[in-house]
């Protein structure tokens, strides 16, 4: 008969201080409930006795404790945790009784509540941040599926643990704990295959009354329950408004039940097919997690939650298989530990188990997402100096008042859509909220991850255009001149007797009327033109004036009539000229008067009337010589034509946006996890008119290679009618792109063409973008574009052309990595040499260029002194508007030279100095590859060329036995732990710096896996 013994050790107490009377506890995969208390992986109640009656809570609570189970003097199980609660009971003859609650360190996260925003981070990255903030370093991930980065993930009025549970369950992650002598490791998995397994099978004791000397399982009861047979999720994305986003997953092993138990839900909380497929599968696995479930009893203490084991010796051979423990309840009694209880009874241990077949994946219970009770106020933000900051969809960035971590800049939020008064296909209204505006933000379905701006408000500093309530009858639409002074305005005054419509254009007012324009003015019209006025009428002008016409022309007046000029006057015409009146006709001039005609000049006159012709003058000369007087010739000026509108085309003639051509309908129905049917456009099943489909002409395809040409989705991308492919995508099209890369000579590793766009695929795309020179034989006019690892139209056409040309990549053994690329990614997000950061909250002040050279620390000043562009900055100081304008102007005019000069300056003043500094301390890195050199570069940029950080992180290590991976982990973890000591920044920047340390560690480890050489120049 095996002899059992239980021991408990609390850090800081003598081993002999406590004896275990008994314990009860529960372990579970992820969270559960035990005795109406939450159980976060495990929870034990341990009853103790001690000869010491003066033990205090300070000696127990929040301390690490270890419960050990021994069999025949050998340790068979250890439960490591922290003491959450201590109860002190009665004192007997020799002992005082205590009871404590043992829980995982993870439970500490339940005591912190927060609201904050995570951007462009995956769930494992977010979880690691939560754990590290609490000082939990013993955790690990064993995941089969790569979790996509989340554009915008909000922890909203939740404890850290509630948030962790929620996002982990969304991605299908469950956790368990691996116990050791001095610690317990939190293990996250997404597949039963990743759970630890006992090395030896556990026997089943089927004989009542029989004895067995080894731990065993008894009372196995296997239950089969009808559950949901399939799931269907549906969602929506404004980027593909007509696309179905439907994902359907069919359950397996359901022959025993009806197949029509459907679980439908919308929205499904995803925006692409790859995530939708995974989420649908995860939802089904959760709903069916107890469809095949077994209950059993055991005295094997190794059977903890999350452990797989093989069962043997069961009379039903179907039960002799591998099982996964999803929940275990443990009991142990040790009555002989106390002398005053007479030592009656033996030490016992037993447990009750909840098991599932190990081929089934257990999913955690989904947690309700916190609902935003209603709209909230936010402020529109953007980069320093920007008044209007938006993307091609008119989305803006905002800062919420509760956000304690961001710096109220373009990194404060995701792009947030803005509701407009009217929105159609290239018609409607558009008013972009500007930086500094206060907006009302609502949330789709109450989801804090999906903000949308639904209104705008004034406040104490952003006031209305007119003072209120003095102008309460005025309705106003006033804009403000961008990067200048002034405004445009349309306002309506509704005060009785003072009604008015006011239109103010700060510069130009252009109008295009496609047909008639009718105006009726019941009173006066006044028109003042301060400069010139031009009018052009293509046909006729009709003018009727019921009263007078008065004109005053300060200079000349010219009239040119192509045909006849006719005036009819009812009474008289009076023309007066200060000097001369000239009349000239090419043929004749006829002057006719009904009664009298008079010509008068110089005291003489000729008068013609009914009485005859009268000539009066000092002398009358007939054929007496002399000459006729002459008048001035016509000198009128041609009228200048008015200028035309800059854009006179009607809206109906505008080119429709690409998104309209990419609209799809229908549903992607997933039959099993390995296949996804190809989505067909709605036009594939319905013709747009009454013409037979057979008569429609098939347009010529752009793609030409046999590999890529058959894909309709890739053809759409070639026409810029579909989105680009990037890391995190999963589809048949990605698989085709991977096959193309392999055919062109790129190595994608063991996974090969698996349809998952991972880091290997991204690296291969970047290598292709760098190395391929377009021949333009297949596609005459295109550009590959930036080296970004994204397959857009240009890269797709290049791949197609390379396949047609038979091009092969010939440098696939040791690829060359550009030194400093990782640093540039994290310093300036790869935005180029002209980028400027404001430095709000940063000890370094405003920062410049690819590597964000500091102004407060004098780095950018040193760079200017050595720059060939030095004269451009003469008399200018960094962090001023004038300096910034010159900096960005140089970047736009000389982008390559400016970038290379910055690179060489940082190499000379930071990287080379740090390499020499480390060499002087005996640390040599000549044989390390790109990942380590990028680590050194990035650290020197962030902490200075003479920093001791790398030396301190590696001090005492055996460098000869260390791998590149070891070096990266030690240095980045050192940064994470010492952030607040190393940086004189604001708390919000500390948070960003910690996030960077975690993210950069991941990026460098991925680079280390690629094994690339580095170009040190």
Curated annotation (Swiss-Prot):
Changing residue 827 to Q: Almost complete loss of enzymatic activity. Disruption phenotype: Mutants are unable to secrete TseL. This is Type VI secretion system spike protein VgrG3. Part of the type VI secretion system specialized secretion system, which delivers several virulence factors in both prokaryotic and eukaryotic cells during infection. Forms the spike at the tip of the elongating tube formed by haemolysin co-regulated protein Hcp. Allows the delivery of the TseL antibacterial toxin to target cells where it exerts its toxicity. Additionally, acts directly as an effector and targets the cell wall peptidoglycan layer of prey cells for degradation via its C-terminus. Toxicity is counteracted by a cognate immunity protein TsiV3. One of its GO terms (cellular component) is extracellular region. GO terms for molecular function: hydrolase activity. InterPro entries: Gp5/Vgr_OB, Gp5_Vgr_C, Peptidoglycan-bd-like, PGBD-like_sf, PGBDSf, T6SS_RhsGE_Vgr_subset, T6SS_Vgr_RhsGE, T6SS_VgrG/RHS. The active site is at 842. It holds the Pfam family Phage_base_V. Its main location: secreted. It comes from the Bacteria. Interacts with TsiV3. Interacts with TseL. NCBIfam families: vgr_GE (TIGR01646), VI_Rhs_Vgr (TIGR03361). Its EC number is 3.2.1.-. Changing residue 842 to N: Complete loss of enzymatic activity. It is found in: Secreted. The gene is vgrG3. Belongs to the VgrG protein family. It comes from Vibrio cholerae serotype O1 (strain ATCC 39315 / El Tor Inaba N16961). Keywords: Hydrolase, Secreted.
């Amino acid at each position: 008969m095996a002899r059992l013994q239980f021991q408990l050790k609390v850090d800081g107490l003598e081993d002999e201080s406590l004896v275990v009377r008994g314990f009860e506890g529960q372990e579970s995969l992820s969270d559960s409930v035990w005795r109406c208390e939450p159980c976060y992986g495990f929870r034990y109640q341990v009853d103790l006795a001690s000869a010491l009656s003066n033990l205090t809570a300070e000696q127990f609570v929040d301390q690490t404790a270890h419960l050990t189970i021994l069999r025949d003097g050998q340790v068979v199980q250890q439960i490591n945790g922290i003491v959450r609660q201590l109860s002190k009971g009665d004192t007997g003859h020799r002992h005082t009784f205590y009871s404590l609650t043992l829980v995982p360190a993870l439970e500490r996260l339940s005591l912190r509540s927060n609201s904050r925003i995570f951007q462009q981070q995956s769930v494992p990255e977010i979880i690691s941040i939560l754990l590290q903030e609490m000082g939990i370093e013993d955790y690990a991930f064993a995941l089969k599926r790569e979790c996509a980065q989340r554009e915008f993930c909000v922890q909203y009025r939740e404890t850290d643990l509630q948030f962790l549970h929620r996002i982990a369950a969304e991605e299908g992650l469950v956790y368990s704990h691996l116990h050791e002598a001095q610690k317990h490791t939190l293990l996250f998995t997404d597949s039963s295959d990743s759970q630890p397994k006992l090395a030896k099978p556990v026997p089943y004791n089927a004989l009542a009354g029989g004895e067995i000397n080894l731990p065993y399982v008894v009372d196995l009861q296997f239950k089969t329950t009808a559950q949901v047979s399939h799931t269907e999720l549906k969602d929506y994305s404004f980027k593909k408004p007509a696309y179905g986003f439907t994902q359907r997953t069919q359950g397996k092993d359901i022959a025993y039940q009806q197949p029509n138990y459907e679980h439908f839900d919308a929205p499904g909380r995803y925006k692409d097919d790859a995530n939708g497929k995974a989420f649908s599968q995860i939802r089904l696995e959760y709903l069916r997690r107890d469809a095949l479930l077994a209950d059993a009893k055991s005295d094997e203490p190794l059977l903890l939650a999350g452990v797989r084991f093989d069962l043997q010796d069961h009379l039903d051979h179907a039960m002799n298989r591998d099982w996964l423990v999803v929940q275990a309840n443990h009991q142990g009694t040790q009555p002989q530990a106390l002398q005053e209880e007479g030592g009656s009874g033996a030490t016992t241990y037993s447990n009750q188990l909840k098991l599932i077949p190990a081929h089934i994946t257990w999913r955690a219970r989904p947690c309700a997402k916190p609902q935003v009770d209603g709209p909230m106020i936010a402020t529109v933000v953007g980069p320093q100096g920007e008044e209007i900051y938006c993307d091609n969809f008119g989305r803006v960035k905002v800062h919420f008042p509760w956000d304690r971590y961001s710096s109220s800049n373009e990194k404060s939020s995701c792009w947030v859509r803005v509701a407009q008064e009217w929105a159609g296909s290239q018609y409607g209204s558009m008013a972009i909220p500007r930086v500094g505006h206060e907006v009302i933000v609502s949330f789709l379905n109450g989801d804090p991850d999906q903000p949308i701006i639904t209104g705008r408000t004034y406040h104490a500093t952003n006031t209305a255009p007119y003072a209120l309530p003095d102008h309460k009858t005025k309705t106003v639409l006033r804009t403000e001149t961008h990067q200048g002074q002034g405004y445009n305005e349309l306002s309506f005054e509704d005060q009785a007797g003072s009604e008015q419509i006011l239109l103010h254009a700060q510069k130009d007012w252009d109008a295009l009327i496609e047909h008639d324009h009718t105006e009726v003015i019941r009173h006066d019209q006044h028109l003042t033109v301060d400069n010139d006025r031009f009018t052009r009428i293509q046909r006729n002008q009709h003018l009727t004036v019921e009263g007078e016409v008065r004109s005053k022309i300060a200079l000349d007046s010219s009239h040119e009539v192509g045909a006849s000029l006719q005036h009819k006057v009812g009474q008289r015409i009076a023309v007066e000229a200060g000097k001369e009146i000239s009349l000239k006709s090419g043929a004749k001039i006829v002057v006719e008067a009904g009664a009298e005609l008079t010509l008068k000049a110089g005291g003489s006159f000729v008068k013609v009337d009914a009485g005859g012709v009268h000539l009066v003058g000092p002398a009358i000369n007939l054929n007496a010589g002399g000459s006729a007087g002459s008048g001035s010739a016509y000198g009128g000026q041609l009228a200048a034509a008015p200028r035309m509108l800059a854009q006179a085309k009607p809206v109906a003639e505008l080119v429709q946006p690409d998104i309209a051509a990419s609209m799809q309908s229908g549903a992607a129905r997933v039959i099993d996890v390995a296949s996804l049917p190809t989505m067909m456009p709605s036009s594939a099943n319905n013709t747009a008119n009454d013409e037979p489909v057979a008569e429609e002409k098939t347009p010529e395809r752009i793609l030409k290679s046999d590999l890529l040409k058959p894909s309709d989705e890739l053809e759409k991308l070639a026409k810029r009618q579909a989105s680009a492919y990037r890391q995190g995508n999963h589809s048949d099209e990605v698989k085709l792109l991977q096959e193309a890369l392999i055919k062109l000579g790129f190595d994608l590793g063991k996974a090969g063409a698996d349809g998952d766009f991972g880091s290997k695929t991204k690296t291969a795309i970047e290598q292709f973008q760098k190395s391929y020179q377009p021949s333009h034989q297949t596609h005459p006019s295109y550009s590959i574009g930036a080296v970004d690892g994204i397959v857009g139209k240009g890269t797709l056409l290049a791949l197609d052309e390379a396949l047609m040309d038979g091009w092969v990549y010939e440098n696939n053994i040791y690829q060359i990595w550009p030194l400093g690329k990782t640093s540039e990614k994290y310093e300036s997000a790869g935005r180029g040499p002209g980028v400027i950061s404001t430095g709000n909250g940063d000890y370094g002040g405003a920062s410049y260029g690819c590597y964000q050279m500091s102004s407060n620390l004098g780095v950018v000043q040193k760079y200017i002194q050595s720059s060939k562009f030095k004269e451009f900055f003469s008399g200018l100081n960094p962090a001023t508007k004038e300096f910034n304008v010159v900096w960005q102007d140089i970047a736009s005019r000389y982008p390559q030279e400016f970038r290379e000069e910055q690179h060489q300056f940082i190499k000379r003043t930071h990287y080379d100095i740090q390499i020499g500094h480390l060499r002087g301390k005996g640390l040599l890195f000549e044989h390390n590859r790109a990942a380590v050199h990028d680590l050194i570069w990035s650290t020197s940029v962030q902490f200075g060329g003479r920093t001791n950080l790398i030396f301190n992180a590696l001090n005492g290590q055996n460098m000869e036995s260390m791998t590149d991976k070891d070096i990266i982990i030690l240095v980045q973890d050192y940064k994470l732990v010492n952030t607040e000591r190393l940086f004189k920044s604001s708390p919000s920047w500390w948070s960003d710096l910690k996030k960077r340390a975690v993210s950069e560690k991941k990026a460098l480890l991925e680079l280390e896996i690629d094994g690339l050489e580095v170009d040190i120049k």
